[in-house]
A protein has these predicted regions:
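N-terminal-biased segments
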Residues: 1-20, 88, 142-146, 162-174
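N-terminal leader/targeting and accessory segments in enzymes
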Residues: 1-49, 53-68, 77-79, 136, ...
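ATP-dependent carboxylate-amine ligase catalytic core
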Residues: 23, 27-38, 64-157, 173-175
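Alpha-helical scaffold segments in soluble metabolic enzymes
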Residues: 28, 57-60, 95-98, 102, ...
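Buried hydrophobic positions in well-ordered alpha/beta secondary-structure cores of metabolic enzymes
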Residues: 45-48, 52, 69, 125, ...
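Glycine-/small-residue-rich active-site loops that bind phosphorylated ligands and cofactors
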Residues: 50, 91, 147, 170, ...
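Acidic, Mg2+-coordinating active-site environments of NTP-dependent enzymes
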Residues: 110-112, 135-144, 159-233
Length: 233
């Protein structure tokens, strides 16, 4: 399998699942792959605006601090392999082809057993997690694709940090048609045992579900003051 064949095979997978929103397909896929999602520490990022920027900055900080840091983002800008990075370097074409073959073989095994195969984003996320585990990353910075609660990335155990960027109206046909409903889905990445960092100027309507998720999981929300945030050059 070549890089182009791998990309075409991934794009040929369904975009939406037959059985609706669930983490069961993703968990089944990772179980077949040896559960790579349990082999690295994670910073999980959800929200509407600024996810990609925050993910890139967090990855850069950890890399410059001397940690081997994976990064998976969605979507990419110019090159499909932008979605898979370690210490700022994209996955090689050969590795993409090899890991795509492994993930698709696992998907075929699930289907042969009578299960439902993964959608494209689930397969892509599995490739990222498998690579991070094989490369023994210290950390992985993981950006959600859509929402949070049922996003394929949310199969990870409790992250070290769950970061919520600014919540806005997006994907209303899937996440809900109010800020509160959308925030509730994004806040689904908050798990017991993690730290939660919240955007300083979060809309009031979004705060209720975020505070509720923190209370349910016994986590503390850290909300920096906007005046305390500055870029170091």
């Amino acid at each position: 399998m070549t890089e182009q064949q791998a990309i075409e095979a991934l794009h040929a997978l369904p975009r939406l699942p037959r059985s609706g929103a669930s983490l069961e397909r993703m968990q089944a896929l990772l179980d077949h792959l040896g559960n790579p999602e349990k082999q690295f520490k994670c910073i999980h990022i959800a929200g509407t605006n600024g996810k990609g920027t925050l993910a890139a900055m967090t990855s850069s900080i950890l890399t410059h601090a001397g940690y081997k840091t994976g990064l998976t983002i969605s979507p990419y800008v110019l090159n499909f392999r932008e979605r898979f990075q370690i210490n700022g370097q994209m996955m090689s074409p050969r590795t993409l082809a090899s890991l795509t073959r492994k993930v698709l073989d696992a998907a075929d095994a699930i289907i042969a057993e009578g299960g439902e195969g993964p959608v494209e984003f689930e397969a892509v996320t599995a490739i990222a997690f498998l690579w991070f585990a094989r490369q023994k990353c210290d950390f992985a910075v993981v950006e959600t694709g859509l929402g949070g609660r049922y996003d394929a990335t949310n199969v990870i155990p409790a992250p070290l940090v769950a970061a919520i960027t600014r919540i806005g109206m997006d994907h209303t046909e899937i996440l809900g048609d109010t800020l509160a409903e959308i925030a509730a889905e994004k806040a689904g990445i908050i798990k017991e045992g993690c730290a939660v960092v919240n955007y300083p100027e979060q809309p009031a309507e979004a705060m209720g579900p975020i505070l509720g998720a923190a209370a349910e999981t016994n986590t503390v929300i850290i909300t920096p003051e906007m005046d305390d945030i500055r870029l170091l050059r």
